[in-house]
């Protein structure tokens, strides 16, 4: 069974959309293997998004991700990475499929409700960035 990382970003946390977003994941057959709310430090946000360090939007992304608490979770299920990506929708909410999380709750490319791992390899890296192995349960057991 695959695992992937999902982050409910500060905009969605601030607008009390956590329950609605979690419900979308669960109704699609993804289970929560770990979840916590954190307020990222500058160092944590920069480390997590280090792959984008040279991109022009990097500082804006970091500033946004530290602007309020986020909910980080490990989603588990069949094809979890691809299913999560499909549920999230396109990065730009205006291009996201109707009914997708970003179409429902996103405002712009930068303020787009959620983050999700883009590959199995990155999912493993991202999950370990936020969670120790002992914090993750087998949600399908």
Swiss-Prot record:
Listed EC numbers: 2.7.4.6
Gene Ontology terms describing biological process: CTP biosynthetic process; GTP biosynthetic process; UTP biosynthetic process
Cited Gene3D superfamilies: Nucleoside diphosphate kinase-like domain
Subcellular location: Cytoplasm
Annotated catalysed reactions: a 2'-deoxyribonucleoside 5'-diphosphate + ATP = a 2'-deoxyribonucleoside 5'-triphosphate + ADP; a ribonucleoside 5'-diphosphate + ATP = a ribonucleoside 5'-triphosphate + ADP
Keywords: ATP-binding, Cytoplasm, Kinase, Magnesium, Metal-binding, Nucleotide metabolism, Nucleotide-binding, Phosphoprotein, Transferase
Family: Belongs to the NDK family.
Protein known as: Nucleoside diphosphate kinase
Species assigned in the record: Chlamydia muridarum (strain MoPn / Nigg)
């Amino acid at each position: 069974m695959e695992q992937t990382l999902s982050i409910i970003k500060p905009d969605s946390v601030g607008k009390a959309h956590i329950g609605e977003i979690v419900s979308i994941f669960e109704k699609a057959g993804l289970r929560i293997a770990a979840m916590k709310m954190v307020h990222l430090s500058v160092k944590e946000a920069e480390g997590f998004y280090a792959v984008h360090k040279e991109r022009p939007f990097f500082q804006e992304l970091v500033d946004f991700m530290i602007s309020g608490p986020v909910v980080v979770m490990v989603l588990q299920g069949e094809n979890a990475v691809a299913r999560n990506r499909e549920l999230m929708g396109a990065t730009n909410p205006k291009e996201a499929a109707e009914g997708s999380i970003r179409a429902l709750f996103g405002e712009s490319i930068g303020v787009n409700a959620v983050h999700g791992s883009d590959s199995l390899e990155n999912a493993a890296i991202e999950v370990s960035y936020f969670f120790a192995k002992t914090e993750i349960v087998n949600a399908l057991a």
